[in-house]
Amino acid sequence: MNMMLAMLINITLSLCLISLAFWLPQLNLYSEKASPYECGFDPMSSARLPFSMKFFLVGITFLLLDLEIALLLPLPWAIQSTNMITTTIVSLSLVSILALGLSYEWMNKGLEWTE
């Protein structure tokens, strides 16, 4: 009962804060705030640079695979099984899933820089 009450209070408080932030925005736009700042000089070109989508996808793929490897490293201690075969099968299945994901990215040319 205490956990349900705590969850109800947390959800209610979260919804109140989200709605408050949504309905009471600070919209004080004036010329100094809207102009780009570049060390006191007028900007020579646009401040927005084009972003490579390929670089973004390769970076996201790297982060996902890196996170999965970080979760895979403590696996033998997390399983705590005296049976070595079970630990090996679980580890190999996770590595196989990672390898399948990497091969899928590779076959769909998600890891190539040039087109």
UniProtKB/Swiss-Prot annotation:
Residue ranges spanning the membrane: these are: 4-24, 55-75, 84-104
State where the protein is found: Mitochondrion inner membrane
Q: Which reaction does it catalyse?
A: a ubiquinone + NADH + 5 H(+)(in) = a ubiquinol + NAD(+) + 4 H(+)(out)
Sorted UniProt keywords: Electron transport, Membrane, Mitochondrion, Mitochondrion inner membrane, NAD, Respiratory chain, Translocase, Transmembrane, Transmembrane helix, Transport, Ubiquinone
For this record, the Gene Ontology CC terms, alphabetical, are:
mitochondrial inner membrane; NADH dehydrogenase complex
Q: Which GO terms describe its molecular function?
A: NADH dehydrogenase (ubiquinone) activity
Q: Name one Pfam family in it.
A: Oxidored_q4
GO BP of this protein: mitochondrial electron transport, NADH to ubiquinone
Tell me yes or no: is Repeat among this UniProt entry's keywords. Answer: no
Q: How does it sit in the membrane?
A: Multi-pass membrane protein
Q: Which Gene3D superfamilies does the entry mention?
A: NADH:ubiquinone/plastoquinone oxidoreductase, chain 3 (1.20.58.1610)
Q: What class of enzyme is it?
A: translocase
Signal peptide feature range: none
List, alphabetically, the InterPro entries matched.
Answer: NADH_UbQ/plastoQ_OxRdtase_su3, NDAH_ubi_oxred_su3_sf
**What is this enzyme's EC?**
7.1.1.2
Its biological purpose is as follows:
Core subunit of the mitochondrial membrane respiratory chain NADH dehydrogenase (Complex I) which catalyzes electron transfer from NADH through the respiratory chain, using ubiquinone as an electron acceptor. Essential for the catalytic activity of complex I.
| Similarity-based family | Belongs to the complex I subunit 3 family.
Query: Quaternary structure per UniProt?
Result: Core subunit of respiratory chain NADH dehydrogenase (Complex I) which is composed of 45 different subunits. Interacts with TMEM186. Interacts with TMEM242.
Q: What is this protein called?
A: NADH-ubiquinone oxidoreductase chain 3
- From the UniProt record, report the name of the gene that encodes this protein: MT-ND3
